[in-house]
């Protein structure tokens, strides 16, 4: 049996118990893939992470990210929460307000802004993204599983499949009320995601000026609705960026978790260059809710 420091971090909130929790286990180099997966299944959170020594010189640490069912190459809220945990614990120190995370998706640069924990925002740049093709049949099946009105698409851009670590089908609805009124059929939605090799569906609609309400559904990995989803927010950034006709920079906030009695907030910045490449940055706050030791 080995002893490991452990923190449970609430992400996309600085109040505690209002965002999305991630379990962070330190000094996990001696844990096997099987052990990490077993622990993630036991914590039963949407993601559990394991901090290891980096294998790339530029990185401050290596992060393994697990859902209860599988390992992910990248995920947003575990990235922000784990960065907060390693800095708060003194595991590593930011250099010029930067931390470099190594994960299966490659190197992820994080920026830390703010002097005090309650004022600190941690943001990451999406390590990569791909806009993929998907079938009209699959989109129709998702719309049916979510109970989306048939005429919604005349008011917004069409759905887009985006791979930014996980694969999200991103759907825009006319407004936040439409998003909150969705009543998903999770079994049907899970089957569509399984058939098409997606992790899930992220839906968003306008809440106000430069703000959106969003919901992310991933029943295939036993996360019917994620209280706050960083990669989902990043996919929304890619979706919005891909619709821009000229080079531009824009930013907006995303509210998430409303239907789960949470109050999660993320900030998204999008830079679209003259060659149509898109840089997306997702930021959030975090707070330690549980700290102690685990015995494995």
From Swiss-Prot:
Q: What does this protein do?
A: May have isomerase activity. Enhances target gene silencing when coexpressed with antisense RNA.
NCBIfam families linked = PhzF_family (TIGR00654)
What is this enzyme's EC? 5.1.-.-
The EC category is isomerase
Q: Which residues form the active site?
A: 47
Extract one GO BP annotation from the record: biosynthetic process
The primary gene name is aes1
The family assignment reads: Belongs to the PhzF family.
Q: Mind listing the GO molecular function terms for this protein? A: isomerase activity
tRNA-binding recorded as keyword: no
The protein's name is Antisense-enhancing sequence 1
């Amino acid at each position: 049996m080995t002893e490991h420091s452990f923190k449970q971090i609430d992400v996309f909130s600085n109040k505690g118990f209002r965002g999305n929790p991630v379990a962070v286990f330190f000094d996990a180099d001696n844990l096997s893939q099987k052990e990490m997966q077993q622990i993630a299944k036991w914590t039963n959170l949407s993601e559990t992470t394991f901090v290891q020594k980096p294998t790339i010189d530029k990185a401050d640490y290596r992060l393994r990210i697990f859902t209860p069912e599988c390992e992910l190459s990248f995920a947003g809220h575990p990235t922000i929460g784990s960065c907060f945990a390693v800095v708060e614990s003194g595991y590593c120190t930011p250099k010029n307000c930067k931390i470099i995370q190594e994960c299966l998706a490659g190197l992820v640069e994080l920026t830390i802004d703010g002097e005090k924990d309650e004022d600190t925002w941690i943001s990451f740049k999406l390590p990569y993204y791909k806009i993929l093709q998907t079938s009209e049949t699959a989109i129709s099946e998702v719309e049916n599983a979510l109970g989306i009105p048939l005429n919604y698409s005349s008011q917004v851009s069409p759905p887009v499949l985006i791979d930014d670590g996980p694969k999200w089908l991103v759907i825009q609805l006319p407004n936040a009320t439409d998003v909150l009124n969705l009543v998903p059929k999770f079994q049907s939605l899970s089957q569509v995601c399984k058939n098409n090799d997606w992790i899930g569906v992220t839906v968003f609609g306008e809440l106000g000026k430069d703000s959106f309400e969003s919901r992310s559904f991933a029943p295939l990995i036993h996360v019917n609705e994620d209280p706050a989803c960083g990669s989902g927010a990043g996919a929304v950034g890619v979706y919005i960026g891909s619709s821009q006709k000229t080079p531009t920079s824009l930013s907006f906030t995303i509210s998430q978790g409303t239907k789960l009695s949470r109050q999660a907030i993320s900030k998204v910045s999008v830079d679209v260059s003259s060659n149509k490449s898109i840089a997306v940055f997702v930021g959030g706050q975090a707070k330690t809710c549980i700290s102690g030791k685990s015995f494995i």
